[in-house]
Every structure is written in structure tokens, then in C-alpha cells.
Amino acid sequence: MAEKSREERKQNVIEVLNEARAMELHAIYQYMNQHYGLDDMDYGELAKNIKLVAIDEMRHAEMFAERIKELGGEPVAESTEKVQRAQEAGQIFKHDSMLEDTTIDKYNEFLLVCRENGDSISVKLFEQIIEEEQEHLGYFENISDHLENLGSAYLARIAGTPASTGGFSKGFISGQGAE
């Protein structure tokens, strides 16, 4: 079997970077939709933290786009899936846990593609983003567990809390949300 050309290897990496970017775009749309819904339900603290996670996902999407451009590719601008709308508070965090878990699995696969194609910079990018996605997963699982175990008592504690993230927000990871 002939060795892949440098251009073929680069295209393989661009392909997984674009797939990851599309996944991030979906997460942004999904989490912002949930932010608005939770804010409307008056669960400000939960709305705020989901918005901060969405901001992290925006940063991830931008990081993938920059790497794609460095490799000579064109970053995708479309999401991979449709947004789940009108979710109940209890559904949101189970859904988001599954979304993050799937993302982590896919990114680990993409990392291997980058490694197999000799792109250590993209490998490091995926490692960094996977670490942040694992923090998001931990947060979503924690809230999901609280909702499952405490139900309306937990939501009553959250009701009426502010949803504002302030003027400029660094995101969930950079701003150390859910402290």
C-alpha cells in the first residue's frame, strides 16, 4: 500500500477538524436555546452557566476554524444537528450530558486521525478541548444528579437567581463557572 501524500494527510485532518467545528456550532445553538428557556423559567443560575458553556463552545469553534485555515481549508459554517427546543429543566441536563459524552468520544477518535496523519498541533488542540468538554460533562452530570435526587426542591433554590453573566464573559472554563 502506498503511503498517503502530505496533501491527503492534511485533507484527512481538515475533514475531522471541520466535523468537530460543526459539532461545536450545534452545541452553541443548543446551549443558547436552553439558556433562553431556563431564563424564561426563572432559573437564572442554570441559564447563566449554560450560556457560559456556550461561550466556551464558541471559543472551541473558533480554535478549530483557525487551525483549518492554517492548513489551507475552509471552515464549515453549518451545525450538524437540529436544536432540541422547549425542553423541561430536567431534560436539559441529561440531554447535555449525552451531547458532551458523545463529543468527547468523537474528539478522541478525531485526535487519533490527526496523530495517524502526523499533525501533532491538531492532536494538542483536541487534547485541550477534550479536557474542557470533560469539565462541561462533569457540570451537566452534577446538575442532572441534583435534579434527579432533589427535583423541585433543587429548582426552588435556583428560582429567581440572576441570569446575567455581566458585560464581557470569559466562558465557563475561563471564568470558572459553577464555583
Predicted regions and their residues:
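Iron-associated oxidoreductase/ferritin-like identity signal
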Residues: M1-E179
